[in-house]
Amino acid sequence: MGNTIFNYLSTLRIFSLIVCMLLILMCATHDIQAQNTLKEKQPSARSNTMTEKTNLSIGKKFPEVKDDSLEKTPVFLPDAARGKVTLIAVAFLRESQSQIDSWLEPFVESFGNKEGFTFYEVPMLHWGYKFMRFMIDGGMRAGIPQEKHKHVVTMYGDVEKYIKALNLDLRYGYAFLLDREGIIRWEGQGFSTPETLKALFETAERLAK
């Protein structure tokens, strides 16, 4: 009886390992395809191509995101930001990190310590990556200052749902400015510029009045 149980557990472990390997392979294939799209279509590593999108998401409520922050606390967006003017930066690829940083860092510097404002960074990953969450989130915790952990919420799930809901292109990072009710009032794509940052700041100040 004991040997039978151990044989069963051994078989179960092998099966689980195979499933995990297949999921990792699926995720890697998804990433390679996305990166190839990025390399083939992205016009410049430092471009900011707002002309490719007409801000169709403005006026919509930001779609619900439910996941844990790097602080290991559950966060429900946009409800967690209700009552505040909020910048949410979204990225799908590693290559987009510098793009969303170009929005987040100036915003945090100008509004991070002001009452009535908040911000979130939301990396969006395919659901298959959830099996590697402890490694991914652990690496992010090591590279991000602890005081910002509560502002980073990695979404593991149906990425395509958000791409369709907000009319997004996974090649780019995005910055969404929400009013106190969670409605998108301003949007930025790609890298920020002095002009687009000025527009972001002016809109944030107006929404706070």
Question: Language-model segments: what does each one mean?
Answer:
Residues 1-12:
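N-terminal secretory signal peptides that target proteins for export/translocation
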Residues 15-26:
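Bacterial N-terminal signal peptides
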Residues 35-63:
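N-proximal helix/coil linker or "cap" segments that precede and/or mark the start of modular domains
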Residues 65-85:
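A short beta-strand-turn-helix
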Residues 80-100:
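Short active-site neighborhood of thiol/selenol oxidoreductases, capturing the structured segment around
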Residues 95-145:
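Structural microenvironment flanking redox-active thiols in thiol-disulfide oxidoreductases
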Residues 134-144, 151-170:
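Thioredoxin-like thiol-disulfide oxidoreductase module
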Residues 171-209:
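Thiol-/selenol-based redox modules, centered on thioredoxin-like
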